[in-house]
Amino acid sequence: MNFLGFAHWFMSIRISQLKDHSISVDQARYATSIFTKYLDTATVKVSNKFYKTTLSADMVFTKEDVSTSDEQIERLTREYNIHYRACIGSLIYLLSTRVDLSFAVHKLARFSANPGKLHFEGLVHLLR
């Protein structure tokens, strides 16, 4: 078997082999593409404020917050211009290198079948 060299990219994950023989992995390019794809197209008024936390402490998600009909989900998707399930799926793939987001992403992913207005607000907060 021939040595083909060191890997630099694998499935949108950048692999850096440092001089001390350690390996670093990151998905900076993929994360940037997620943020530009979903946040820049969001039609809801988003402030320029950046948050230090992934979810606000006062955001409590319950069964009462879910959408009760498909029409409500479609209206929220049009209002926020974010496809909730696709964005959650992209963020779940990002968790392979950003484990600090896992609690917030999985909390929002629980409601991917019937997201309500509060869930969309939480998703926008996470993307900020």
What are these regions (language model features)?
Residues 1-128:
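Long, low-complexity, charge-biased intrinsically disordered regions
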